[in-house]
Amino acid sequence: MTLPSGVERHDFGGETSLATQGQPVYGERTDGDWRRWDPHRSKLGAMLAHGMDTGLGGGETVLYLGAAAGTTVSHVADFGGPTYAVEFAPRPVRELLDAAESRRNLFPLLKDARKPESYAHVVEPVDVVVQDVATRGQARVATLNKQFLTDDGRLLAAIKARSEDVTADPDAVFDSVRAELSAEYELLETARLDPYHEDHLGIVARPRKD
């Protein structure tokens, strides 16, 4: 797998890890201008660490759903183009705003990813939608936001089984999510994100042509 331009492997205290160039956000280790992209704290980082073919090349316009305090989306903005970061909870948005201060291409939006009509007037067509909202109905969130993707764009989703049903077998949850997504997306690759994130599934997909 080829890493996106702007993402490299660096040594951090004897441990090789993915890294991007930018101001530190969450206390991560640094190597000069490079900061460690910790896959234990980032589902997209885990997808890249697993060698999934995300289709990212660098410079893409991105819609990031479930940005939280900016841990992952700050890395995305380090190597991406315009990056729209949707987060519903006010408290983490304050930290997200801090991450955006040194990233002129990162645009925090205090919005609900389940209501894309509330930010449709702001977000331009994007090359990538990252679905990182850990709530029931994760596939529906990805489907609702398909409208922003270009025809050859990519969905990069991290599905948390316990957010869908804490009592169900994770494999059954993942089967259900894959089936729901398949109505709107062509699934290109899926992989469990262990050992970085237990009971999570990484998904790479593209919009189905009408």
From Swiss-Prot:
This is Fibrillarin-like rRNA/tRNA 2'-O-methyltransferase. The lineage of its organism: Archaea, Methanobacteriati, Methanobacteriota, Stenosarchaea group, Halobacteria. PANTHER family: FIBRILLARIN, RRNA 2-O-METHYLTRANSFERASE FIBRILLARIN. S-adenosyl-L-methionine binds at residues 71-72, 87-88, 112-113, 132-135. SMART domains: Fibrillarin (SM01206). Involved in pre-rRNA and tRNA processing. Utilizes the methyl donor S-adenosyl-L-methionine to catalyze the site-specific 2'-hydroxyl methylation of ribose moieties in rRNA and tRNA. Site specificity is provided by a guide RNA that base pairs with the substrate. Methylation occurs at a characteristic distance from the sequence involved in base pairing with the guide RNA. Residues 1-34 are annotated as: Disordered. NCBIfam families: PRK04266.1-2 (NF003276), PRK04266.1-4 (NF003278). It comes from the Archaea. Its EC number is 2.1.1.-. InterPro entries: Fibrillarin, Fibrillarin_CS, SAM-dependent_MTases_sf. GO terms for biological process: box C/D sno(s)RNA 3'-end processing; tRNA processing. Interacts with nop5. Component of box C/D small ribonucleoprotein (sRNP) particles that contain rpl7ae, FlpA and nop5, plus a guide RNA. Belongs to the methyltransferase superfamily. Fibrillarin family. Pfam families: Fibrillarin (PF01269). Keywords: Methyltransferase, RNA-binding, rRNA processing, Transferase, tRNA processing. GO terms for molecular function: histone H2AQ104 methyltransferase activity; RNA binding; rRNA methyltransferase activity.
